């Protein structure tokens, strides 16, 4: 709501930086105080951030790359705290597949630093690391499976409805039906 109001009030340029910062702050708060809500919030960010970017770009002009799109990976990477907290016991608790994946991603990142640009390596790291961290976070907290399952089902039900309605509206109003 704040993002939409800020966009229509003409503060789109300011929201380009405030949206990722605000999302990160809310993500930290939820991670520490309400871990189950953090999971839903993270998914909702992945669902609606492209729409938020479109609204901001509509008001303030298109910008590529857009800092708005950093919000979901930044909030997802908060799960790195789970990795550092459980790293000493990860191997003995069945975390070997995750540790192998993390090792592979960091190996690829180091190769990209040597063979190509730093920016390209960081972008690839930003693509590969958040899903691994999120998966590790979920696997370490398996004891909360029932609560996570309920939250994920509710999040995805509403996410499918909202994104489906938006996709249908966009298809019908942009003239794509005439193609």
Residue ranges of predicted features:
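Aromatic-anchored transmembrane helix interface
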Residues: 63-77, 95-109, 116-140, 160
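Membrane-interfacial helix-loop-helix modules of multi-pass inner-membrane proteins that assemble, modify
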Residues: 53-55, 109-119, 162-179
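Membrane-interfacial loop-to-transmembrane alpha-helix junctions, especially the N-terminal start
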Residues: 30-44, 87-101, 148-156
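Hydrophobic alpha-helical membrane-embedded or membrane-associated segments
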Residues: 2-4, 38, 42-46, 100, ...
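Alpha-helical transmembrane segments of integral membrane proteins, especially early/N-terminal helices
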Residues: 27-35, 86-93, 162-176
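N-terminal signal-anchor transmembrane segment
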Residues: 1-85, 106-111
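Cytoplasmic juxtamembrane interface segments
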Residues: 135-153
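Juxtamembrane transmembrane-helix termini
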Residues: 56, 83-89, 114, 140-146, ...
């Amino acid at each position: 709501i704040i993002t939409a109001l800020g966009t229509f009030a003409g503060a789109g340029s300011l929201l380009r930086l405030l949206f990722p910062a605000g999302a990160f702050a809310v993500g930290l708060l939820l991670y520490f105080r309400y871990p189950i809500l953090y999971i839903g919030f993270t998914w909702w960010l992945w669902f609606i951030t492209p729409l938020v970017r479109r609204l901001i770009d509509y008001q303030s002009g298109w910008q590529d790359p857009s800092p708005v799109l950093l919000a979901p990976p930044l909030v997802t990477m908060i799960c790195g705290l789970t990795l550092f907290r459980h790293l000493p016991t990860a191997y003995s608790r069945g975390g070997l597949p995750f540790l192998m994946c993390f090792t592979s991603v960091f190996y690829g990142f180091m190769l990209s630093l040597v063979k190509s640009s730093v920016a390209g390596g960081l972008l690839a790291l930003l693509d590969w690391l958040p899903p691994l961290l999120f998966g590790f976070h979920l696997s370490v907290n398996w004891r909360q499976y029932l609560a996570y399952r309920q939250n994920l089902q509710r999040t995805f039900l509403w996410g499918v409805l909202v994104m489906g309605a938006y996709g249908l509206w966009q298809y019908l109003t942009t003239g794509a039906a005439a193609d």
